[in-house]
């Protein structure tokens, strides 16, 4: 595969596909001092928030969940900030720029998982858990095996996602700011560690909230200026875009991104169920006081994200008009300077001048910081809370657990920087696709069935969960992205790019079969305990709130 701008596609779920659709060579741009100054303002402000947060982090609850004192509205903004990546902004708008209507269809994949979280997961998750989703999965099952599986699933997802984000950050900053790749990776790693190490969930939450507000403001302004240009008429917008786009009226037709129904279904399932299995997203539901606030969190987050993806559609069509038809934004060969991923950035310059271009570039960097901070905290909690405090050293004090968590943050940060260096010139787009497939095939089935299926047993959850995880990994390796494009084989053993349809099926079937055939005394006891769990999940009786949470 040609060297592509993985900076944005890497941050996009199932980005292997997006990388093909919006590829463009990485070209280091001149140093953008406006962007650097605005980003430094953001860094200074957020480090001030981290210092403020560090004075309020006194307990395990404060560190992992901000004491459970985040409101539903604040948490909704933070979730949106955690989920809306640089790829969502620049990558989706680039897809619209190149493929038109197909870009809108693709962006819907990011939203379809949220109704599942709202109606099936958020309330029960908050009522049953404390710090991580493993608390919920192990509520009536054996603590050790389930927490090990959940922690492994979380850490694999976090590691893959983190590598992709670090490499993407380096490439993106090299492109937008003109900074050296290695400096960019170290900068992201150090800031990430500082936010999480000193400020915990409270600092991470406010970094995500600020990033979400800035991103929504920037995208809203760009969309407003585009619509102003066409007299606030969507008919004029589409007509002018079709008139200047090389594909003409074809940009208004669907069907160009996914070639067969199996791939389309697998991609959709992976996006839908993967979202509901991402550890750094699920962890956010423990930062609110009760199930009602958890539901409100999803409601607000879905609203913010839905609005945002509508804006990216307008921005993409605006870029077709104002950027694609303007020779000033093209190189000697007629291609967009910096690649198609720069479409929204060039549009920022077209509608707001150099100052607004600097603002959008700084927001793109802030976006990456918000995402990696959430990932790091989720990985640290999986090690310190799930593995250390509940498996390897049961009865550990809060102080010991927090110490392990902070050591893990440092280790994760250093590893992320090193892997960012090692994977600089590699095609890492598949990593986020694999992360979503694992989240959908391991984490999601266990969370869902542990809350809803009374006959689930530890044996079924363990065997089915591991089968789902391994199937996702093996099929991804044997598929076209890794087997052909990376390893260089002539033909893929597994013909489909997205394994989720098959790995999710294997996980659910495995959990059902091994639970149904489990006639052990332990399995029967676990089934009997479902009623007490169900009452707790529905009523919240016994849930600790606020600072005692």
Curated annotation (Swiss-Prot):
Main localization (coarse): membrane
The protein's name in its UniProt record: Cation/acetate symporter ActP
Molecular function per GO: acetate transmembrane transporter activity; glycolate transmembrane transporter activity; symporter activity
Superkingdom to which the source organism belongs: Bacteria
GO CC entries: plasma membrane
InterPro entries associated with the record: Cation/Ac_symporter_ActP, Na/Glc_symporter_sf, Na/solute_symporter, Na/solute_symporter_CS, Sodium:Solute_Symporter
Protein location: Cell inner membrane
Segments passing through the bilayer: 33-53, 77-97, 103-123, 148-168, 183-203, 206-226, 262-282, 303-323, 355-375, 404-424, 428-448, 464-484, 493-513
Biological process per Gene Ontology, one example term: plasma membrane acetate transport
Keyword match RNA-binding: no
NCBIfam families cross-referenced by the UniProt entry: PRK09395.1 (NF006903), PRK12488.1 (NF009135), sss (TIGR00813), symport_actP (TIGR02711)
Organism this protein belongs to: Salmonella paratyphi C (strain RKS4594)
PROSITE patterns, alphabetized: NA_SOLUT_SYMP_1, NA_SOLUT_SYMP_2, NA_SOLUT_SYMP_3
Record-linked PANTHER family: CATION_ACETATE SYMPORTER ACTP, SODIUM/PROLINE SYMPORTER-RELATED
Its membrane topology: Multi-pass membrane protein
